[in-house]
Amino acid sequence: MTKKNLAVCSFCGRSEKDVEKLIAGPSVYICDYCIKLCSGILDKTPAPATQEIATSSTSSPTSLRVLTPKEIKRHIDSYVIGQERAKKTISVAVYNHYKRIRALMQDKQVGYGKSNVLLLGPTGSGKTLIAKTLAKILDVPFTIADATTLTEAGYVGEDVENIVLRLLQAADYDVARAERGIIYIDEIDKIGRTTANVSITRDVSGEGVQQALLKIIEGTVANIPPKGGRKHPNQEYIRVNTENILFIVGGAFVNLDKIIAKRLGRTTIGFSEETDLAVTNRDHLLAKVETEDLIAFGMIPEFIGRFNCIVNCEELTLDELVEILTEPANAIVKQYTELFEEENVKLIFEKEALYAIAQKAKQAKTGARALGMILENLLRDLMFEIPSDPTVEAIRIEEDTITQNKPPVIIQKSPEAIA
């Protein structure tokens, strides 16, 4: 290696051959000599008050306030409509999980493990929103990962350790905070092994990924590369203990109801998938899910065994979709109403129009996710025109606006008001 190719300390300029250890950071290096020098300076300098507060928030046993299950559910209710059974189950699981962490921080003996959660349910039923809301009310770092992008080590794709890296980034590289965070892994059903995956080729995105995830979910000290592992193989690793990280995984698990029905000796109802009766029957079956059903679906026993809380999110009803439009603290209709109020224009939705929007979302088969797209398409042209038109006083959205694509009703200001 030539002199110009040697990495050097960004502070003192010593090359890697002149020091015992050279630690790499994002685009910088620091040697062991400079670390010792900085450490000596810090030992002689009183820490600022803000640093003392931060330290106390991560290490003090009393700093972790555990909300009761009722308090947790009440907060979730402010943002998540429906899913009463799921919200109660998760509230209890999260309460027990953080109560366990607090006990461990106080050096108490704990005889129960952590409460990882597996959420079943169709797209747009609120699985991700529940996880996001939990992280918000508990004030802990949170990250979302997509299971379909994960692969085993050695294959093209994302290493499972990168999930922990994203949580560490969400915690601003505060390891103690990250170790109490929440990781939500979506589309977990997509990594179920299938009978088609015979031994001719390696099951890159199925059983192998479950095995890789198993280690960090059950709890291990993971070596996390701060820049990601594959493009920067020589960087210094950060050690993160995943034992107290809460893992929530979710997936639609399409046709799992048929596996459950077979176990129960039932036949699935012979109606169209869109009928309310078929949906009710499917939700009823998923509520009876057992570990053996998930194994038959393609999840490995060791993986499923790490989730002692398995709960079903039911498909949202028409009334619940209407509530989602108007009731939560961050309801989408409230958001658009505020946008138009900033232009001094009143936005009015007739009740029939709200139900028409909900029906359209239901037909799209993406649950609550379709609501935002429908409203955006409906109001985009108005949001373009209104800022340039001071004559508009109000806009009324009627049922025909949704069902027959008729223009919204524009109510003009009186001439006196314009003047």
Swiss-Prot record:
Family label: Belongs to the ClpX chaperone family.
GO molecular function: ATP binding; ATP hydrolysis activity; ATP-dependent protein folding chaperone; protein dimerization activity; unfolded protein binding; zinc ion binding
Entry binding sites for Zn(2+): C9, C12, C31, C34
Function in brief: ATP-dependent specificity component of the Clp protease. It directs the protease to specific substrates. Can perform chaperone functions in the absence of ClpP.
Phylogenetic placement of the source organism: Bacteria, Pseudomonadati, Chlamydiota, Chlamydiia, Chlamydiales
UniProt signal peptide: none
Amino acids binding ATP: P122, T123, G124, S125, G126, K127, T128, L129
Protein name: ATP-dependent Clp protease ATP-binding subunit ClpX
Domain of life: Bacteria
PANTHER family in UniProt: ATP-DEPENDENT CLP PROTEASE ATP-BINDING SUBUNIT CLPX-LIKE, MITOCHONDRIAL, ATP-DEPENDENT CLP PROTEASE ATP-BINDING SUBUNIT CLPX-LIKE, MITOCHONDRIAL-RELATED
InterPro entries: AAA+_ATPase, ATP-dep_Clp_protease_ClpX, ATPase_AAA_core, Clp_ATPase_C, Clp_protease_ATP-bd_su_ClpX, ClpX_bact, P-loop_NTPase, Znf_CppX_C4
